Amino acid sequence: MKNLLKNAATGQKLSQLSALISLFTLIVYTIYGIVYIYFDWVVFLALALGVVCAEGYVLLNSRASRCLNLASVACLSYGVGLFFLNSYPVWADRLNNISMYGSRGTLFPVISIILLVFASAIVEIVSCFHTDGKDVNK
């Protein structure tokens, strides 16, 4: 694995970084979901599939695996969108200082998870444009 990253192209390294950020976000989301009882399997699977696609691009190293970057971004985008929709009770209660929805938790973990997924998606998008030829076996 060490040699794989040492000889990897910039796009692969960025995709690896995106996978690590996404994995960290997945762990944070799982803890948040279990503690505040907001866990959603579809969000979890979308974020996990984003990690798998980003890592698949790094490990497969072929022309066919280039689409895995975009698949990772699509999965992360779907996951963060669904997470945002699922967190509307927290947004409504905390921003309006009411308890209409009886939400648990604060905005800090919600905003943190959203920002981490955005960071991961942006790094993955940048990795799509960094193919310098070393990353594709013939």
Question: Predicted segments — roles?
Answer:
Residues 1-22, 127-138:
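Cytosolic juxtamembrane helix and N-cap/initiation of the first transmembrane helix
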Residues 49-60, 123-127:
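Alpha-helical transmembrane segments in multipass membrane proteins, preferentially the mid-helix core
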Residues 35-42, 81-112:
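Interfacial non-cytosolic loop connecting adjacent transmembrane helices
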Residues 97-135:
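Alpha-helical membrane-associated segments of multi-pass integral membrane proteins
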Residues 8-17, 26-53:
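Transmembrane alpha-helix entry/boundary detector in multi-pass membrane proteins
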Residues 55-87:
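Loop-to-transmembrane helix junctions at the membrane interface
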